[in-house]
Structures are given as structure tokens and as C-alpha cells.
Amino acid sequence: MRFFNLVMAVTSMATLWAVAGAPVWAQQPISAQSAAQKLMVVPGSKYPGRMHVLPATMETTQWGWFDNGELPRLIIDSGDTVAIESMSHSHGQLYPGRTIEELKKLRTDWPARGPMTLTGPIFVNGAEPGDTLQIKIQKIVPRPWGANFNVPGLFGQFPSRFPDGQVKYFYLDNEKKTTEFAPGIEIPLRPFPGTLGVARKDPGRYNAVPPGPFAGNLDNRDLVEGTTLHVPVFVRGALVWQGDSHAAQGNGEVNLTGLETAFQEITLTMTVDKATKLEWPRIETPTEWITMGFDEDLTKALANAKSETAKFIAEQRKVSPEQAMPMVSKTSDCRVTQVVDIKKGVHCMTSKDVAKSLAEPRPTAETPQYLV
């Protein structure tokens, strides 16, 4: 029995499905006191709201796709916290010992879907289209192994560099928060969810690889413990998914994968924000705001990120985006997020202590501050 009898929970959740296959959330409110909800509430939490647990099983996960008509696997109230378990790629078929030939077959036999396994969706009571959902990452505990691989000649930014493919497995020392890449070379662990987001507006089943306004497969290495994802809501209940667990990754994710793993636990607090209206997701760290842009063309992704950053600065300083645009190059650090998710990503990091004035003050004396 894993946390609770999941079969009973999913059976109870099935009563939420309305006549003719239409989701009940399109017709009437859903109570957080449902039978399924009570099964998933656990006592003894130090985090905000009720505490829930959602394990990763074949009943609570999907392999490589989003669908906003998917039955919720958990219903929570705004402000509640969920400890979520995740699976490795391809419904748990990535694990130490798998050969690169086996991993390649998982991609070539299932080309229409992404490789990531997604736990969810989670329905958040009170979330409506036009709202913003705040998802704070409270805690991440990876499993004790990770993998980095390239499918032979097929994927990644530089497939020709790996014509035969490669896979390497690692032991993750969660106490030291490191892994040994080679004798004498240690890589610090910095776990984050590669995929975290809400249901897209469009009905139907979509490949989960490309990110978008709904967030999703951001692959942003700065979405770590203590940060909050702010994402616009497109369907009632938001419908939150999490997966594609990473133990570490560099900006760009240039060889297709980061240090791929699965999470024993990722603990998220979800809060509905009725006041903030967003068109694209943002990440809040203790010291910075991160704005994002996506496009198949990296230059256009940068332009989108720059526009979002100017919009953010304009909101903060109460000026027009045109006035804020020159500040982007002065106050923001723009980085390539990833180049492997069909739609490439660029993100710009802006200090919470953004410039106090858009106008540079007139100097009172000639100093090295102005001339060298």
C-alpha cells in the first residue's frame, strides 16, 4: 500500500466525471471534502493549508502529453500543499541498466509524445480562467540515481556529435548534494522540476515537450526549492501537472538531457491569485523575478523574453513598456534556458530591487563613475 489505497481514490474520483464525458468542473463546484479528497489528506504538515500526498502510479500519471479534459487525480483548496511523487521517463522505463538502444526504441516507437512522465492533474478549487496560480516549491527530494543520455543522432541541439548515442548513470548523494561525474570531479545537485504547469486552453491531447503560456516543460534550472512559479490559468481548476525531474542541469540543456531522475517528493503549495493578470509565466526567487520567452527561433524567443521583461519593469515602476525597454539591458540578465524542447527558451532575471529611476541623474562632478 503506497501512502493509501490509490485504486479506491481513483474510483471515487470517477464520480466527478459528468454525463457524456464532460468534466464536472464545467458544470458545478467541486467540494474539497469529497471522498477522494479525504483519502488524500494527511496530518502533521508544517506547510500552509491542508497537506495532501499524490504518489506516482500508472493511475496518476500520463506519459508525454497534456489534455485539459483529463480527470483530476486530486482536488485541493487554494493555499493547500501537496507532496507529489514523480516517475522517470516513459512511465518509469528509464532506470540504471537500460541501454541506449532500449532508450532509443522508447522514443522511436512513441514519436508523437514526449519522454517525460507527468503526475496529475491536480484541480485547485477557486481557480478560474484569467486568474494566476502561484505554485511555491517547498521541498525536493530526488531518488538516489540519475541519468544523462543522447538518443543516437535524433534529438538535441547537436545530434551529429553523438551519432552512436550515449547514456551514463550516476549515484546521487542527497546528503552531500553532489554526484561524481568522474574520479575527482563532482557535480553539485540542484534539483528542479523540468515540467511544471497548468492545462492549456486548447482541448485535446498535446505533446508535452514544447513549453508555452501554460508553463509546462520550462526546463529552467532556477525553478528550485524556495521559488514560486506564477502561471496564468486557462481552464477551471487550473489542472496542475509535474514531471521531468532533474537533479541538475546547465542553462541551455545543450546535449538533450540534464541529470534526469525521479523525485521521491516534490512539495508544492498552490494559491489562487485573483488580482494578478498574466499572459506568460514568471518565476519568483527570493531576490529576483524571471520572465520568459519561447519560440522555435532562438532570436524570437529572446525578443519575446525581452518584451515580457520590459512589461514586468513597466508594471513595477508604473511607466510604459516603451520607457521600460531600455532598462532591460541595464538591469536584467538574459540567458538561454534550453534549446531542445522544439520551442527554445530564453529567460531574463531581474533583481527585485529594480532601478529606482528610469532617468540617469545628472552628474555633479566628473568621476570614474562616468568616464574612464
Where are these regions (language model features)?
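Bacterial N-terminal signal peptides
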Residues: V7-A20
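Boundary at the C-terminal end of the N-terminal hydrophobic targeting segment
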Residues: A18-A20, V24-A26, A32
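N-terminal, Lys/Arg-enriched amphipathic/low-complexity engagement segments
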Residues: S34-Q37, V41-W110
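Short, structured beta-strand/loop micro-motifs enriched in basic residues and often containing a Trp
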Residues: T57-D67, P111-T119, Y206-F214
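Short, Lys/Arg- and Gly-enriched loop/turn segments at beta-strand edges
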Residues: H89-I100, I140-N150, G237-A247, T337-V340
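Intrinsically disordered, low-complexity linker/loop segments enriched in Gly/Pro
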Residues: M116, K139-L223
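Conserved mixed alpha/beta catalytic, RNA-binding, or beta-rich assembly cores of soluble enzyme
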Residues: P191-N217, R221-T299, A310
